[in-house]
Amino acid sequence: MPELPEVETSRRGIEPHLVGATILHAHIRNGRLRWPVSDKIYRLSDTPVLSVQRRAKYLLLELPDGWIIIHLGMSGSLRILSEALPAEKHDHVDLVMSNGKILRYTDPRRFGAWLWTKELEGHNVLAHLGPEPLSDEFNGEYLQQKCAKKKTAIKPWLMDNKLVVGVGNIYASESLFAAGIHPDRLASSLSTEECDLLARVIKAVLLRSIEQGGTTLKDFLQSDGKPGYFAQELQVYGRKGEPCRVCGTPIVATKHAQRATFYCRHCQK
């Protein structure tokens, strides 16, 4: 599933081609996504795009009378086309722009979403979200406060959007490795120093992935059709049985709530 770096990479890639241009019309080939494509999106016509923002794993297209909320789901990606290339099987939505560009949404598993809302505040998919991990609000002090009485493993807690948004399976595993923290540790067992370190490395890992265009394991592509290159720098995720790049110990894979977790039993305590 695309996580924060992939969604932010998509935002940065599409923003220059959408802001200041006008949506001439939307072409919906298959509106049966995780939730049906909102009726308002079908009827878009001569609508300028004012901004392209991100909240958690949601892309937000600001229009004069409301917002398009896009979620990439498990396998979605957005591309900017310079011409109307023939659509393939999993190309479900096109926004045809006044500058000759086309924003094309591809989603093999159709777990994504294209929603419309008049107001962002209070929308059900955006309500109850925790802070952005790259914000000043997310720091060691905040993390320690939230972990202090939490009797659950730190790995799934990091993936809870009520704690912090956008840190999914890949970046939770990678951040815990970078901090030297075992994913099975109780959140409440983390010291002040460990919380400070973990908050810092989460930011560093996410920023590095954004620099590299995110992580492509299967479906995700950047808006120019290129893969995300952070996959080449993964330390533990997807490397079961391979030697740890630090100590040489084989990487272990376990499952937490049906999600694979990767770690080094020597480097992470």
Curated annotation (Swiss-Prot):
Binds 1 zinc ion per subunit. SMART domains: Fapy_DNA_glyco (SM00898), H2TH (SM01232). The active site is at 2 (schiff-base intermediate with dna), 3 (proton donor), 57 (proton donor), 259 (proton donor). A zinc finger (FPG-type) spans 235-269. It comes from the Bacteria. GO terms for biological process: base-excision repair. It catalyses: Hydrolysis of DNA containing ring-opened 7-methylguanine residues, releasing 2,6-diamino-4-hydroxy-5-(N-methyl)formamidopyrimidine; 2'-deoxyribonucleotide-(2'-deoxyribose 5'-phosphate)-2'-deoxyribonucleotide-DNA = a 3'-end 2'-deoxyribonucleotide-(2,3-dehydro-2,3-deoxyribose 5'-phosphate)-DNA + a 5'-end 5'-phospho-2'-deoxyribonucleoside-DNA + H(+). The keyword Ribonucleoprotein does not apply. GO terms for molecular function: 8-oxo-7,8-dihydroguanine DNA N-glycosylase activity; class I DNA-(apurinic or apyrimidinic site) endonuclease activity; damaged DNA binding; zinc ion binding. Keywords: DNA damage, DNA repair, DNA-binding, Glycosidase, Hydrolase, Lyase, Metal-binding, Multifunctional enzyme, Zinc, Zinc-finger. Its EC number is 3.2.2.23, 4.2.99.18. Pfam families: Fapy_DNA_glyco, H2TH, zf-FPG_IleRS. DNA binds at residues 90, 109, 150. Its cofactor is Zn(2+). Monomer. Belongs to the FPG family. Involved in base excision repair of DNA damaged by oxidation or by mutagenic agents. Acts as a DNA glycosylase that recognizes and removes damaged bases. Has a preference for oxidized purines, such as 7,8-dihydro-8-oxoguanine (8-oxoG). Has AP (apurinic/apyrimidinic) lyase activity and introduces nicks in the DNA strand. Cleaves the DNA backbone by beta-delta elimination to generate a single-strand break at the site of the removed base with both 3'- and 5'-phosphates. This is Formamidopyrimidine-DNA glycosylase. It comes from Salmonella dublin (strain CT_02021853). The gene is mutM.
